[in-house]
């Protein structure tokens, strides 16, 4: 059996420790798990962030925030061991995971896990996908998410679908969270990704 690494990235104000138990429960049989931690301390709410922003989360990122995204992407790449990778995350972590398709790491990514997230670089993502081999994505989002609205989040899934990538959509009626009622479906999707190599 081929093995690899499941990489799961926490959201804003999260920590690698908070992501670890979810990641462990989702890991394909025989796969390693790593949960890198962002390096930017959140100035008011505790925990860590992959980038900071003061303005409306539906607006494009300012130049400083865009640089923080790029720096965070490189920091995550440094932590990832050799071999196949399934990469995902919650909220900001999912946005970083998706953006990693725009890097040299894309050759080793066998699947994406996008939970309660959106793309922070929609144009870059849409430009890069036609040049990449499609791979499976599992996308989870709540219709009552007040931080990343469902309408904004669906754009992320649709960018992949428009490029012919297979997306398993796990929609739920809850808010900005991992829906534990769909954990088995999430785990099955991730195992399929691992089985594809």
Which role fits each region the language model picked out?
Residues 3-82:
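Serine-hydrolase catalytic machinery in alpha/beta-hydrolase-like enzymes
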Residues 151-157, 161-197:
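C-terminal catalytic histidine-bearing segment of alpha/beta-hydrolase fold enzymes
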Residues 107-119:
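A conserved short beta-strand
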Residues 45-51, 117-137:
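Flexible "cap/lid" loop of the alpha/beta hydrolase fold
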Residues 87-89, 115:
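Short beta-strand immediately N-terminal to the catalytic nucleophile in serine-hydrolase-like folds
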Residues 89-93, 97:
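Gly/Ala-rich beta-loop-alpha elbow adjacent to hydrolase catalytic centers
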Residues 138-141, 145:
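Short beta-strand/loop motif that positions the catalytic acidic residue
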Residues 11-14, 118, 143:
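Active-site glycine-rich loops that stabilize anionic/oxyanionic intermediates
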């Amino acid at each position: 059996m081929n093995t690899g690494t499941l990489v799961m990235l926490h959201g804003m104000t999260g920590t690698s420790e908070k992501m670890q138990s979810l990641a462990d429960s989702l890991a394909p049989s025989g796969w390693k798990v790593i949960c890198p931690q962002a390096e930017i301390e959140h100035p008011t709410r505790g925990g860590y962030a992959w980038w900071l922003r003061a303005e409306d989360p539906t607006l494009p990122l300012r130049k400083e925030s865009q640089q923080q995204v790029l720096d965070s992407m490189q920091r995550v790449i440094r932590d990832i061991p050799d071999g196949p990778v399934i990469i995902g995350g919650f909220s900001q972590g999912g946005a970083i995971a998706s953006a990693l398709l725009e890097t040299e790491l894309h050759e080793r990514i066998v699947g994406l896990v996008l939970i309660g997230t959106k793309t922070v670089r929609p144009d870059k993502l849409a430009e890069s996908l036609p040049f990449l081999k499609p791979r499976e994505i599992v996308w989870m989002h709540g219709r009552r998410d007040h931080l990343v609205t469902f309408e904004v989040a669906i754009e992320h899934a649709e960018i992949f679908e428009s490029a012919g990538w297979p997306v398993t959509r796990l929609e739920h009626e809850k808010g900005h969270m991992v829906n534990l009622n769909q954990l088995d479906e999430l785990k099955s999707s991730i195992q399929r990704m691992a089985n594809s190599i």
